[in-house]
Amino acid sequence: MPSNSGDDNVLQVLIKNFDVLALPLVTLVYPLYASVKAIETRSLPEDEQWLTYWVLYALISLFELTFSKPLEWFPIWPYMKLFGICWLVLPQFNGAEHIYKHFIRPFYRDPQRATTKIWYVPHKKFNFFPKRDDDDILTAAEKYMEQHGTEAFERMIVKKDSYERGRSSRGINNHMIFDDDYRY
């Protein structure tokens, strides 16, 4: 005869609400403890790990706030979030560094190029019957000259060259303060 003791009920409640119990521990309590520990030890790699984690946690929170209604339709979302944040938090996986290095940092360093990469769809890969073998830049230049004329194209090039020469003579550069050999 199966027993219906209080211990079995508590265990069932814990299992059913695992995500509700584990999520605050994994997302807030452990990272908070590890962040304070990193500050106290003055370890640069640990500081970087936890700063990147908090940046990503803020982005995840913004995503959840923005899409809270559609996320209610996905009952697996809390488990996916728990799994993903475990990957970000645990230093063995170094997930926060990976995501920051490959997705956030390129966007931060050059937002225009990063968004262009996201929305750029090369026509050659999807066009089974290409009309010409020219590069996309050459095609765009030809279209511009057809629409606006060669004189407008030449003026645009001269304007760009004079702008670049003016910037270089004034010593102005458009580089971020981070070097390319920076850890992240």
Swiss-Prot record:
It comes from the Eukaryota. The keyword Transmembrane helix applies. One of its GO terms (cellular component) is membrane. Its main location: membrane. Predominantly expressed in flower buds and stem. It is found in: Membrane. Keywords: Membrane, Transmembrane, Transmembrane helix. InterPro entries: TB2_DP1_HVA22 (IPR004345). Coiled coil: none annotated. GO terms for biological process: hyperosmotic salinity response; response to abscisic acid; response to water deprivation. The chain crosses the membrane at residues 13-33, 51-71, 73-93. The keyword Transmembrane applies. It is a multi-pass membrane protein. Belongs to the DP1 family. This is HVA22-like protein c. The lineage of its organism: Eukaryota, Viridiplantae, Streptophyta, Embryophyta, Tracheophyta. The gene is HVA22C.
